[in-house]
Design a protein with these regions (language model features):
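Charge-lined substrate channels and their catalytic hotspots, especially those that engage the 3′ end
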Residues: 2-290, 297-343, 374, 381-382, ...
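Electropositive polyanion-binding surfaces
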Residues: 31-34, 189-193, 214, 220, ...
């Protein structure tokens, strides 16, 4: 009865009790549960939607709700992910068996990345893969995607695959000209099928630009992931109230560190410098390591337009040769950037570190600094690795040597604590002044980069520990333990492909199965294969089997770093979580009890959004790199369509074989091309980690992808002459 139903969870239970007995329409359910009144009606509909989104009930084509029984229905439900080749996949675990359902682009039926979908027409293979098609979209992730306007009210999808189009309100079309790229929110319900095209209603959120605009491709990627260069007018208005230099009244209550030898170390082109460092060695051999971070929270009042926009963006996005900042440049490159030769407001973490690398004590306080020099990684590496001293660095060499000493000690300490070092397979694009890709280089972490990373980790750890024991609201950076099954699956792949020795893998698998392993074991395993030619593949497979780090309002430790306490404190110019950490540092001095209680309530949602926007920025950065690779290989193809490239297979699935060329470009071989290789007797050569030789088959700029054909003639040779 309705009087017994007190909240939405009770309503859900009552719905499940009813559909357990028989299938019911929404009206029959409403009647059976005595749903009356607007409030009860709204809660009832919300409960129905939540149950359907979680895959607990199923709404059939006749309008009946029933319990979602995968075996009985012959359907499964899950979150769809769509790769750049147009194929979708859904991971579902049922009765202890995890299956990857593969959906051809012809059977996506309008599904977009991250949507919750129901799959039908399932055909299981011999492995844990199955083919399926999307029956319906239960919930849109956000429904936003890019279309290109072709006139007369018609749109074509620009970046998504499949036969999909949208119909937008006429009043929204008035602002458009043919060739406009627009960000459209697509409804989940298909309204028609016309000439094999799924038609959806849509609403234009933003005109991104015109297809002929410079940098339109990068603007398109950014818009897809929620990043825009323009700031709202109210943000621009607030900027006018923020000073461009430190004022005398700003110094009140701050420790004056302007007489210390403090400096920054960043990339050569970095303009938003939010961290500076200094160090002293004590007479008894200890170190006082100081990390000074731009005090952005001093200038950005909570809930002001600048703060609201930063919260919305979550992070800065670095897209090839351009940056979409979290704050306007007047903030990120100006008053909050720790530029050389000017006073800046900071939050400082002083750490007393033992000769063995243990942080014995720390202090966190507001300060003012005056950076002595803007250093860059290349110059500092010249000093520390080659003993070459660039002009202007002479007076800083003794300090840099002490810092190097401290960094090496911290590296060893982190190793003992279980920090897992993965091989970086990151690639950076080197561009011309106009943004044209010139080459692709692997990112390397040298002495200077490692030094800054170690110092920032030390500061982040100290701040996290401080707040954990203070027991006040805070944002933490957490990384959970790996899923044992996923890790074992990755190890079995390495064994099957004969990339690693069977004995070494079996030892680790047995430890995992017996529950007797930790991050030290994983670290030892990776170190063991560090000189293996396929170490990047080994490292990548292990890394992708692990969960991603995220933000959370509770301190749960960081598995990958082997740390009990961790947060992000050191980049408040470009990361919203760091700004929140700054705000919540020393909260008992600044906030009353009601405010603290409010943070306890709001932090979970803030952490979830910040984690989401971090993933969006990462994906936008990856897609931008893919775009530059596609543009580069398009030029290569136009110059010489018969050029042969050497590379290595880095990933294989039934729907895709991924190859990384020696020039660091990543491309793909389709299943049909692999089938052809098998037919002519070359299948035994095609394994994970194998060297292969390819020609460019096709390049798609909208989908940011390069397709290869295997060069069978070269595959059969023992010695290959590869064109440079």
């Amino acid at each position: 009865m309705v009087k017994e139903i007190k909240n939405i969870e009770d309503i859900k239970t009552e719905i499940m009790n009813n559909v357990d007995l028989k299938k019911l329409t929404v009206d029959e359910l409403r009647k059976a549960m005595h749903v009356k009144g607007e409030t009860m009606q709204a809660s009832f509909i919300n409960a129905l939607n939540e149950l359907e989104e979680k895959g607990e009930i199923y709404l059939d084509d006749d309008g009946y709700y029933k319990k979602f029984d995968a075996k009985q229905l012959g359907k499964v439900q899950g979150e769809i992910h769509i790769n750049r080749m147009g194929s979708g996949f859904v991971f579902v675990e049922y009765n202890g068996r995890k299956t990857k359902y593969l959906i051809d682009e012809a059977h996506l039926n309008g599904a977009l990345e991250g949507d919750i979908v129901v799959l039908r027409n399932i055909h299981h293979g011999k492995t844990n893969y199955a083919d399926a098609e999307v029956e319906k979209i239960v919930k849109r992730a956000n429904g936003k995607t890019i279309f290109e306007y072709i006139g007369d009210g018609e749109f074509i999808p620009y970046t998504i695959h499949g036969n999909v189009t949208v119909i937008c309100p006429k009043e929204e079309l008035k602002q458009l000209v043919t060739g406009n790229r627009v960000l459209v929110t697509v409804d989940k319900e298909r309204i028609a099928v016309i000439e094999n095209k799924s038609v959806f209603e849509g609403h234009i959120e933003k005109v991104v630009g015109h297809k002929d605009d410079p940098d339109i491709e990068i603007s398109t990627i950014a818009a897809e992931h929620g990043f825009f260069k323009e700031f709202p007018e109210e943000v621009i208005e607030q900027l006018r109230t923020i000073p461009d230099r430190v004022m005398k009244e700003d110094l009140e209550g701050r420790v004056d560190l302007r007489d210390r030898q403090i400096f920054t170390i960043d990339g050569k082109d970095t303009k938003d410098m939010d961290d500076a460092i200094s160090i002293m060695r004590t007479l008894d051999g200890h170190y006082i390591l100081s990390v000074h971070i731009a005090d952005v929270s001093h200038y950005i009042e909570e809930n002001s337009p600048l703060d609201i926009e930063a919260r919305k963006r979550g992070t800065s996005a670095y897209l090839a040769n351009s940056v979409i900042p979290m704050f306007p440049h007047q903030i990120s490159n100006g008053i909050c950037s720790l530029n050389e030769g000017v006073d800046r407001l900071t939050k400082t973490v002083d750490m007393l570190v033992s000769p063995s690398g243990e942080i014995l004590d720390y202090q966190i306080y507001d300060s003012v600094i005056h950076s002595r020099k803007k250093m860059n990684y290349d110059d500092v590496n010249q000093i520390l690795e080659k003993n070459i001293i660039p002009s202007g660095y002479e007076e800083f060499v003794p300090t840099l040597k002490i810092m190097e000493e401290m960094s090496k000690i911290l590296t060893q300490t982190r190793k003992k604590e279980g920090k897992v070092d993965f091989a970086s397979d990151e690639v950076k694009v080197i561009t011309s002044p106009t943004g044209e890709a010139l080459k692709f280089e692997a990112r390397h972490q040298n002495t200077a980069e490692r030094l800054i990373e170690n110092f920032m980790i030390a500061a982040n750890t100290s701040v996290a520990e401080y707040h954990k024991w203070l027991d006040t609201p805070q944002v933490y950076r957490v990384h959970g333990n790996p899923n044992d099954d996923h890790l074992i699956e990755a190890l079995k792949t390495l064994k099957k492909e004969k990339i690693c020795s069977k004995e070494t893998i079996d030892i680790l698998i047995n430890k995992i199965k017996n529950g007797h392993y930790n991050s030290n074991d994983l670290s030892f395993f990776l170190d063991y294969f560090k000189d293996h030619e396929n170490y990047p593949i080994i490292s990548h497979l292990i890394l992708t089997s692990m969960s991603k780090a995220k933000y959370a309002p509770v301190c749960e430790g960081h598995y990958g770093l082997g740390l009990t306490y961790y947060t992000h404190f050191t980049s408040p110019i470009r990361r919203h979580p760091d700004l929140m950490v700054h705000r919540l540092t020393n909260p008992y001095q600044k906030y009353d009890i009601p405010t603290l209680l409010n943070y306890y309530q709001t932090l979970p949602e803030i952490c979830e959004h910040d984690s989401f926007m971090e993933r969006e920025a990462d994906q936008a950065e990856k897609e931008t790199l893919d775009l530059k690779m596609a543009e580069y290989m398009q030029r290569e193809y136009e110059a010489d369509s018969g050029k042969i490239y050497a590379g290595r297979i880095i990933n294989m699935t039934p729907y895709d074989t991924e190859i990384r060329l020696d020039n660091n470009v990543i491309g793909h071989v389709t299943p049909s091309d692999l089938a052809h290789a098998k037919a002519i007797g070359h299948n035994n050569k095609l394994r994970l980690g194998e060297r292969v030789y390819v020609l460019i088959k096709e390049v798609s700029i909208p989908h940011r992808i390069v397709y290869f054909n295997l060069n069978y003639k070269e595959l059969s040779k023992s010695k290959i002459k590869v064109l440079k």
